[in-house]
Amino acid sequence: MASSASMLINYPTTFCGVRNSSNPNNDQFSDQINIPSSLNNNINISKITSKTNKIIPKAVASPVIPSSINSNNITTTTPNIKRIIHEFDPKVPAEDGFTPPSTWYTDPSLYSHELDRIFSKGWQVAGYSDQIKEPNQYFTGSLGNVEYLVCRDGQGKVHAFHNVCTHRASILACGTGKKSCFVCPYHGWVFGLDGSLMKATKTENQVFDPKELGLVTLKVAIWGPFVLISLDRSGSEGTEDVGKEWIGSCAEEVKKHAFDPSLQFINRSEFPMESNWKVFCDNYLDSAYHVPYAHKYYAAELDFDTYKTDLLEKVVIQRVASSSNKPNGFDRLGSEAFYAFIYPNFAVERYGPWMTTMHIGPLGPRKCKLVVDYYLENAMMNDKPYIEKSIMINDNVQKEDVVLCESVQRGLETPAYRSGRYVMPIEKGIHHFHCWLHQTLN
């Protein structure tokens, strides 16, 4: 393993979980960048020639925009979907009510409806501003069945596109890097960082309007360390009030913890799991109800008598003081841990010198992937043993949660389970999440 002094720390991959790579065909058009290894290879982290023609003059990005993630569907709302949604009643007090039915976590048609109603509306975290802090940098990712590409052009403007070539639908770029343009690996079509079609190979004898073949754009905004995208074409770009548009009235509370210039990205860990994305969210929001039973080491770090959960519009904030008796004398959490879950699938955590973000990406009715990004205060960046142990502890917690979530998913698939009950008030965060889901899906 390389020493910390010689190791280059960078974003090793993106939410899509694709390894950093580029097609060799791109070499003739693009600036190259060396993608470094991750912080610790011992930690179980999932990393993720055409003849060209003349430049097509005055090409601009295409104005053709799909209306939603499920752009092939006029609507995903069917009588069956309505029935499934209304099997949960948010008006019934949680103490007396039942949890959503198992079909919320297993039905393929409801999953398609979620992509349309939840993930194609409003802002979603796509990546981090450090990934595109320099001109010509880019990163890629996925959200449901949408592949996206975010870049900063040579003039410093940030763009976001569907990461799909407009010729024959090939995925255009992979991973992260730095390029002066994007070259399709299939037929060598070349697109500028503004999405315009610059070159189309072997088209000398054809006439077509390049304006209709630029990359399909997405709304994009930067809020502090976060790069946000939206598939919803209604409204403004939201670059000034995007925090309030995304989170609501508690944007300042999240900003207070996440906007810290002393923090530096240090590592990414990925955890694919065979469960519905909402199973993980439910698990995250149970106010540590499961922690004493499933996470022995983590439980020893916490003072459960101080645990507090606040419901704030689209955010559920959990706070807990750390235990005075640190396991083996190792202090990872500092005096208090702060966990902010942002509807529908993102969390910001602050504890000790750390910030971690959690992104749970839906991949299907019974499949999702958790991406955990670690940020550390600059003063601790040279303490390699502390860094490795802290990441190992937190990664082990996520691995334990993967086992739990996959077990729950198997149980949801059985005929024995229909709905459950809430244990209040400890599961009020879960109920709040379910009420938001019902409102959005309805």
Swiss-Prot record:
Pfam families documented for this protein: Rieske, Ring_hydroxyl_A
Keyword Thylakoid found? no
Broadest EC class?
oxidoreductase
Could you give the cofactor binding note from the entry? Binds 1 [2Fe-2S] cluster. Binds 1 Fe cation.
**Which residues are listed for [2Fe-2S] cluster binding in this entry?**
C165, H167, C184, H187
Q: Which gene encodes it?
A: CMO
Q: Which UniProt keywords apply?
A: 2Fe-2S, Chloroplast, Iron, Iron-sulfur, Magnesium, Metal-binding, Monooxygenase, Oxidoreductase, Plastid, Stress response, Transit peptide
Which GO annotations describe the biological process of this protein? glycine betaine biosynthetic process from choline
GO CC annotations, alphabetized: chloroplast stroma
Record field: catalytic activity: choline + 2 reduced [2Fe-2S]-[ferredoxin] + O2 + 2 H(+) = betaine aldehyde hydrate + 2 oxidized [2Fe-2S]-[ferredoxin] + H2O
Q: Which residues bind Fe cation?
A: H290, H295
Q: Which PANTHER family match?
A: CHOLINE MONOOXYGENASE, CHLOROPLASTIC (PTHR43756:SF5)
- UniProt-listed SUPFAM superfamilies: Bet v1-like, ISP domain
**Chief localization class?**
plastid
What subcellular locations does the record give?
Plastid, Chloroplast stroma
Known function: Catalyzes the first step of the osmoprotectant glycine betaine synthesis.
Organism annotation: Amaranthus tricolor
A Gene Ontology molecular function term of the record: iron ion binding
Statement: the UniProt record of this protein carries the keyword Plastid:
yes
Q: What is the protein's given name?
A: Choline monooxygenase, chloroplastic
Q: What induces it?
A: By salt, drought and heat stress.
User: What sequence ranges are listed for the domain Rieske?
Assistant: 123-229
